[in-house]
């Protein structure tokens, strides 16, 4: 097959000076194909889908944060120790120590979920702490609104948004100073 293609190409070359139609055909067959597609993955393609181990017993219709303490949270009757990510129908451990550890990587889960999260409520502990403006801008570009509050208000805001049936997630760091620790 390669030999017949080479013979056809040779015959086209011999006819090319006599016919303009064959000259354009010869050029299109002898030029290297132009590659216009990307060969390197984009940032979103680097993150592959993964499986998640869910911490709650039964998937409730809505996630509801019942209480919080310096140790963690009680969400739908399940005790969660340490920082956590609350997404529709799942509770995940969130690997941050303080608000200073919140970066694009630690929030990457929230913009990759399907269906897309409308609002992410971030609880930064005892006080409202400012996050890097580039992080907030990036999340806005991904279509996720971010509300940063102290953890007590973040829990209340999350519960309110969920009660309105909004597609909401929460990223919560337990506060260190709680007057009465219910856990």
Curated annotation (Swiss-Prot):
Is the Mitochondrion keyword given for this protein?
Answer: yes
Q: One of this protein's Pfam families, by short name?
A: DUF498
Question: Which ranges does the record mark as transmembrane?
Answer: none
- What CDD domains does the record point to? Mth938_2P1-like (cd05125)
Q: Which GO terms describe its cellular component?
A: mitochondrial inner membrane; nucleus
Q: Which UniProt keywords apply?
A: Membrane, Mitochondrion, Mitochondrion inner membrane, Nucleus
List localization entries: Nucleus; Mitochondrion inner membrane
GO terms in the biological process aspect are:
mitochondrial respiratory chain complex I assembly
Q: Name the source's superkingdom.
A: Eukaryota
InterPro entries linked: MTH938-like_sf, NDUF3, NDUFAF3/AAMDC
Function, please? Essential factor for the assembly of mitochondrial NADH:ubiquinone oxidoreductase complex (complex I).
Q: Which family does it belong to?
A: Belongs to the NDUFAF3 family.
Q: What is this protein called?
A: NADH dehydrogenase [ubiquinone] 1 alpha subcomplex assembly factor 3
Q: List the top taxonomic levels of the source.
A: Eukaryota, Metazoa, Chordata, Craniata, Vertebrata
